[in-house]
């Protein structure tokens, strides 16, 4: 019984704690990558993403459309 308790403690508590990474690492990495971009490049990327949105039919548009209503 004691052996199973020790095994459960190791695998359910200690092992996940040892393998966890900082939650803020990916965010910091993305921020560092975007700091190198100049403002014009960021605007271009944003405009490209907005152009890729689907247009809706004006007959059934609910106001959530980007360009079509």
From Swiss-Prot:
Domain of life: Eukaryota
Modified residues (4-carboxyglutamate): 54
A cellular-component GO term for this protein: extracellular region
Tissue expression profile of the protein: Expressed by the venom duct.
Location in the cell: Secreted
Record flagged with keyword Secreted: yes
List of residues that carry 4-hydroxyproline: 58
Propeptide: 21-51
UniProt keyword list: Gamma-carboxyglutamic acid, Hydroxylation, Pyrrolidone carboxylic acid, Secreted, Signal, Toxin
A GO molecular-function annotation: ion channel inhibitor activity
Region forming the signal peptide: 1-20
Modified residues (Pyrrolidone carboxylic acid): 52
Main location (coarse class): secreted
InterPro entries, alphabetized: Conotoxin
UniProt function note: Probable toxin.
Entry remark concerning the domains of this protein: The cysteine framework is III (CC-C-C-CC).
UniProt similarity note: Belongs to the conotoxin M superfamily.
Name recorded for this polypeptide: Conotoxin Fr3.1
Provenance organism: Conus frigidus (Frigid cone)
């Amino acid at each position: 019984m004691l052996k199973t308790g020790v095994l459960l403690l190791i695998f359910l508590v200690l092992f996940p704690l040892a393998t966890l990474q900082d939650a803020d690492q990916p965010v910091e990495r993305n921020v560092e990558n975007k700091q190198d971009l100049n403002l014009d490049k960021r605007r271009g990327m944003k405009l490209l993403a907005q152009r890729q949105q689907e247009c809706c039919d004006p007959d059934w548009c609910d106001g959530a459309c980007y360009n079509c209503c």
